[in-house]
Amino acid sequence: PFFYALRREAHFTDERYSLHDNTQLYLSFDFNKSPSTLVIGMIYQKEIAIIDLIICDENSVQGKSPLEACCFKFKEKYLSSGLITRPYLIVTGDASGTAGGSDKVKNENFYTKIESILGIGKSQRKIRKKNIEHILSQEICNSLIYNCNFKIYKSAELVLFDMEQAQIENGKLVKGDRDKGKGLDITDAVRYFMDCV
């Protein structure tokens, strides 16, 4: 398994998470045409936790791309409700999201779009210049799971299922058919979160 240190009985909790004062939330994105995946992680004292998951496709919010829909759903649930304030957000994710494309406006990318929708600054972005190799990511993730008070809360139970399915072969994460829910987009977003902590 990719996450060989992960143990359901030790790392999954049925409890509801609570956001304490000064809790930082990490928003970890995996960008795909569809769906876009947002894993929400929390760091508080010695606890590193995954507290929520938002997955959106082109039908999630009318007139919005999957990425925009993820951002709007997060904004509604966490910012508009007052659960957290903008200064405590850190955005991370797939390093390819900093690249432009043929349909992109100059100096715009996935991260500038996220920052614009959430009303946060570039200084709250924590992105590697390029994604690290899967084999190194595996060691970082398992070291964190083993050595920290790592939890996955019930509100993010799908994260646990995806992590349990993740396999590595010849130094690469084995990905299945995205249409059958085996694209491991959630696992990728989890890796980006753990790699930046």
Predicted features along the sequence, with ranges:
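Residue-level detector of short, conserved catalytic/binding motifs and their immediate flanks
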Residues: 25, 36, 89, 187
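Mg2+-dependent endonuclease catalytic cores in nucleic-acid-processing enzymes, primarily RNase H-like
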Residues: 48-179
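Acidic, Mg2+-coordinating catalytic module of metal-dependent nucleases/exonucleases
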Residues: 176-197
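ATPase catalytic-site recognition across NTP-hydrolyzing enzymes
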Residues: 1-29, 34
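Short beta-strand scaffold segments in enzyme catalytic cores
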Residues: 36-42
